[in-house]
Curated annotation (Swiss-Prot):
Gene Ontology terms: cellular component: cytoplasm; ribonucleoprotein complex; ribosome
Family statement drawn from the similarity comment of this UniProt entry: Belongs to the bacterial ribosomal protein bS6 family.
Source organism: Thermosipho melanesiensis (strain DSM 12029 / CIP 104789 / BI429)
CDD domains: bS6 (cd00473)
GO biological process, one term: translation
HAMAP family recorded: Ribosomal_bS6
Gene name for this UniProt entry: rpsF
Name of the protein described by the UniProt record: Small ribosomal subunit protein bS6
Length: 119
């Protein structure tokens, strides 16, 4: 199963409750439209940007970790593109986390096999 991370930046002049709804809307979209399993949502809140984004020096940052098989990420990119409240977004595959998870599962399988041999 592939693991993805998406970070999106929301305009800071939107009310806090509305920004929460927007972030939850992304999570719901991932679950309902893409069929993804959301592992973690990390809300950073309003932070200073490295450079002005559409005349904003601050923005609300959110990172979402999700997983799925055969996900069409371009659909998620379109979701961000048509909504003006998003200043920036980036989605990428986390191959490092996939490898770590595979290594962990192999280690667990190895310990199960050694227990069976001892019995």
């Amino acid at each position: 199963m592939r693991i993805y991370e998406t970070m999106f930046i929301i305009k800071p002049d939107i009310a806090e409750e509305e920004r929460e709804k927007i972030a939850q809307g992304v999570v719901d979209y991932l679950k309902e439209k893409l069929g993804a399993h959301v592992d973690n949502v990390d809300r950073w809140g309003i932070r200073k940007t490295a450079y002005p984004l559409k005349k904003y020096n601050e923005a609300d940052y959110t990172i979402v970790y999700f997983r799925g098989e055969g996900l069409d990420i371009t659909v998620l990119e379109s979701y961000f593109r048509v909504r003006p409240e998003f200043l920036r977004w980036q989605t990428f595959r986390r191959i490092d986390l996939e490898k770590k998870e595979k290594k962990q599962s192999r280690k667990e399988e190895g310990s199960e096999n050694s227990e069976k041999v001892e019995e």
